[in-house]
From Swiss-Prot:
Name by which UniProt lists this protein: Large ribosomal subunit protein uL16
Compositionally biased residues, Basic residues: 7-17
Pfam families: Ribosomal_L16
Gene3D superfamilies cross-referenced by the UniProt entry: Ribosomal protein L10e/L16 (3.90.1170.10)
GO biological process: translation
HAMAP family reported for this sequence: Ribosomal_uL16
Keywords: Ribonucleoprotein, Ribosomal protein, RNA-binding, rRNA-binding, tRNA-binding
Length: 137
């Protein structure tokens, strides 16, 4: 599972996930990409499940690049504990994703295989995604 190795502070404020992605919104490392079309918090487990799905579908061919990293800790207090007494412990890690952000990229496979792999991976993620091809500038 992906998570930061060390941080200055263990816990974060909740924050808000708004706006559109101004960075990481182009296919940079591969030929095809899976692009987010809405805001979401993607957990490290969801990201790993989607990555495994892509890897299984494309088998030995191709290279997968993960363009997001779960670097935000989400805390939770234990069940049946009263409010107060400080913030809960870190339960899992998420990546905040805005519309337009590239999540995965693939290179070295044909378009039909990449499209099918991304469709299966998108089913594991909590947001709507779009299949995109690299545009040469």
């Amino acid at each position: 599972m992906l998570q930061p190795s060390n941080r200055k502070y263990r816990k974060d404020f909740k924050g808000r996930n708004r706006g559109v992605a101004s960075r990481g919104n182009r296919v940079s490392f591969g030929e095809f990409g899976l692009k987010a079309t809405e805001c979401a918090r993607i957990t490290a487990r969801q990201l790993e499940a989607a990555r495994r799905t892509i890897a299984r579908h494309i088998k030995r061919g191709g290279k997968i690049t993960i363009r997001i990293f779960p670097d935000k800790p989400i805390t939770k207090k234990p069940l049946e504990v009263r409010q107060g007494k400080g913030k809960g412990s870190v339960e899992y890690w998420v990546a905040l994703v805005q519309p337009g952000r590239m999540i995965f990229e693939i290179e070295g496979v044909d378009e039909a295989l990449a499209r099918e792999a991304f469709n299966r991976a998108a089913a594991k993620l909590p947001l709507k995604c779009l299949f995109v091809k690299r545009t040469v500038m």
